[in-house]
Amino acid sequence: MVMNHSSGKSYTLNALPLSYSHQNITITGFNLTGLNYERECGDIFKYPKATERDVILFSYGHTRKWKHNKKDMRFAFSLVRKVLPKVTLVMLTMGDVPQDFIQLMTEFNVTMVPSPKQYLKGWNCVNARIPLSLEYLKQHQSDIDRVAWSDTRDVFYFNDIFATIGMNDLVWMSECVSPTDCFRHSTTGQKLHFYWMWWFYGRDEAFKLTQYNTPTLNGGFGIGGVSRMIQLLTKLNQEMDPKFTFQWGYDQTLLNYLYYKGELIDVGLDVDRCTQRMCFANKLNIVGNGKSTTFSMKGSSCAPVLLHKGLPSRLMEMTITYR
């Protein structure tokens, strides 16, 4: 039995996996059919299904890229709202946002929470979401069971990610695909992380981390019980250096630095190294084309529950509905 200490609610681990078979998503002019969650592909769903007490936290600061990103964001919110209709969606905003952004949030029943004025100067939105998310969760802790920390336009939900997580869990997504080469300055895909670490924590620290065979965490997705998430965000907030809060990449570098240093052990942070539950930019096995297409994880017959990036662009160009 898993206890939610904030609400007194108990969660019982399911003796058998929840009943899932295949997921069909009908897209205008395109069908995504037969996503496989049968038998062993359904074993990942061990916990209660998502309810309105489960929250996905997003953040947004307006940029000139809004018109370009609007289509992607519409697709992502269409998907999450169809897959998780009961979940509470919360958007933490920084500064003024355009009217069509507000309309999009209203369309998908997303609660908008404006940030205090103190975050309008000296803060990048991705860094500000650490203290903003912490404050929101502390204020509403008694109303929340589980919480997902999610990027806004390129995290794709194909099934109930909350049913894979217990109240005492805290799981973060790894960005590296290969567990043997996750933080190498000579590896093109990870070079940015190396130089971020150099910039924020020094050359010696960056080179030291190239010797570790541990994953590079991605700042775009994590999920867990609300108490665990509050513990993590409290630690991140305490360790933030004010002179870097305006710089892109600092939030993720801070997360990785604390993880490598072993300072998140007490928080109980686990890392998902690209499994069926979640994966960053996984290369999918795509079967079919035209009006009938399905996909699974590379090297598996099982469909992913959640992807961060990695979804074929031709699917994102369509309007999504369920059948």
Language-model region placement:
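Short His-Asn-centered micro-motif
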Residues: 58-61, 91-95, 150-152, 173-175, ...
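PAPS-dependent sulfotransferase catalytic domain
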Residues: 172-221, 252
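Catalytic core and acceptor-binding pocket of nucleotide-sugar-dependent glycosyltransferases
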Residues: 202-322
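GT-A fold catalytic core of metal-dependent nucleotide-sugar glycosyltransferases
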Residues: 130-186
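A short acidic (Asp/Glu
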Residues: 100-103, 157-162, 233-234, 256-257
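N-terminal anchoring/stem segment of glycosyltransferases
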Residues: 1-128, 132-144, 227
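A short acidic, often aromatic-flanked loop/helix-cap motif at beta-alpha or helix-coil junctions
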Residues: 118-125, 179-180, 274-280, 314
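Conserved beta-strand elements of beta-rich interaction domains across eukaryotes
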Residues: 63, 96, 154-155, 162-163, ...
